[in-house]
Amino acid sequence: MNMGSLGLYITFLGLLAAIYQLRQNFLQQRTIFEDSISKEYRDIIQRIPYRALIGEEILLSEASAVQNEVYNYMDLCNEQIYLRMSNRVSKKTWNNWQEGMKTNFELKVFNDTLNEVFEKLPSNFIELQSVKALNFSTDPKKCKIYDNLLKWILN
């Protein structure tokens, strides 16, 4: 092997190492970003009474505050869906978030608020409406057509 070939080989190995480092940096930054979104979820859920989180009736005095937090959660869900559509979160993270959406929206106060908002604001939360229509079992990154279809149906 001559010096020119050796130099090319070393350059190639250096390029591979740089690509690997860039990929690792990207994955680390994505994880930090995903964790920040998960913190938003925890902040919202902390403000919802325990009774609501286990599916029990809430006190009338709590209803308005709980509905506000569920609305905030719906907004967060819509953002999470958009982030997956834009490939800003991993499939693993998306699947975890989607499973959480399904579980939370099965709870009475979440489901009641969701249905009320969808009824009163049919053109809002289009992404969330689409994912719910598919029973929280989809990957928005793969298929954006349902979003356009739902917009067409609602108009």
Please name every model-derived segment.
Residues M1-Q67:
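Membrane-proximal alpha-helical anchors
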Residues E62-N155:
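An amphipathic alpha-helical interaction surface
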